[in-house]
Amino acid sequence: MKLDLKSFETYKNSSISLIKEKLIEFYGQERFKKLTLAQIKENIKALNAYPGIEDMKEVEHNDVHIIDENVNTSKAEEAILNGNVLWEHAAAGEATRLGLGTKYLLDLSKFNFSKIREVLINEAVKEGKSEEEINKIKEIKDRQLKEECECEPSDLIPLSLGLRHMLQLIYDIRKLAERNGKYADKVIKKQKMFIILNESTCDEISKELAANNFLGLNPENVLFMEQKSFHGITLRKGELFYDEMDSDGNEKNNKRLHNHGQMVMQKLHNDSIFRILDGERKYLKREEFLKFLEPFKDMISYNIEDLSYLTSSIDLQSLATALELGEERYDMVMEVVGQNPKKPQKGASLFFDPRIKKNVMVESFRLFNLKNEDLKLMNKNFNHYPNTLNSIKKLFEEGLPLGFEVKEAADGKEYIYLCPVQGDINFLVNTAFVTRKELKPIYNWKTGAQTTQTVKAMHDQDKQEGFKELTKKFGL
């Protein structure tokens, strides 16, 4: 059985059937009838484990396609200037590891060093650090934090992470247009963006962009999607179901997102994607969205937490490489970076699978008992989709693998939640993995420990020639 992606409801119904199928395969029909959530939670690593994980081989840096720093970028520049690249911004994340709310809206200019220490302490507590280690964090001086940030947080231009993300792309495209003797405003009007937000902030953020004249973009070229959240799944007397209402008929407070894989699949639902025209949402049918995708030479999917993006949103070498690989019939290009040696973090990692005789990107929750420090080549979460329609159509036909987890909801009870991942598209289509000659460590804002480097990245962004003036152009 496969996921049915025609609508929100068909996704829900087919996902229940697939989870049941997976549990019966693991436990057997008779044990499944008496199965409890506690038993599922106890075996969750084994349930999610990638098949043959024990035989997977580590991939060496030299075994990955190295991006040529001297690659001809003229086709890449032309594709951007003509509006033939779709810029996708995945900004629905709720920063659960940081515990600070929707990441898009975070404005670090409102922080101070006491707040940063608080973030570091909260993270240490969550990780179960010793009292001695926590006390060391409490004793970190403002002077040390300032050295790491290279400024006071209040010195930053007062912008949310999301606005910084959008503005950097506008800034870089304008610079590219000027270098090529093009009128920047006209080039910006040709650009197409797809912005994915969560239910709690979608209205606020989309209206903010509309109020700021879409940062110079044509409203017809800006698509939005509100990633849906889901009630928790309960197992009772051998039956799985989305547990939506209590005995008094009130909606349960147990909704969570189904990870970025569901976000990708939701694009294929009817009436899920919309434009804002004359202040109103105008929804697209699936066929309208597919038609919208037809002209693109590449879709680039950005993750809002990538910090290198804040001073260089356009990677011409990477785009040029993706376009070349697209001509070689690759439908997905994933960039690989090194692990953070100072604070190894979880994430998708590259391995060679001897069963299917190719490299695969495997998400961390499928890696069974591998530790973070065992993960060497990580997914940068910066993906290209040359031949964009091919990967989208394949996704509709097959759906993504369904991992799941048992988590506590806001109502204090535990439920099953699905956690499909975007990167698993690499199992559906011909995928190329690329990296740099000099393997750089992953550089993002996933954890509290990375907050000072995030302030620094924002400070570096503010120092770019003309960036402050661009923010003023839009009244920010």
Language-model-detected regions and their locations in the chain:
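Generic low-polarity alpha-helical segments
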Residues: 1-11, 30, 43, 59, ...
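Generic structural signal of hydrophobic/aromatic residues within well-ordered alpha-helices
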Residues: 19, 23, 40-43, 76, ...
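Low-complexity, highly charged intrinsically disordered N-terminal segments
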Residues: 1-70
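NAD(P)H-binding Rossmann-fold N-terminus in SDR/SDR-like oxidoreductases
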Residues: 97
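C-terminal catalytic/acceptor-binding lobe
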Residues: 395-476
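Domain-scale recognition of functional cores that engage charged ligands
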Residues: 64-86, 92, 100-423, 427, ...
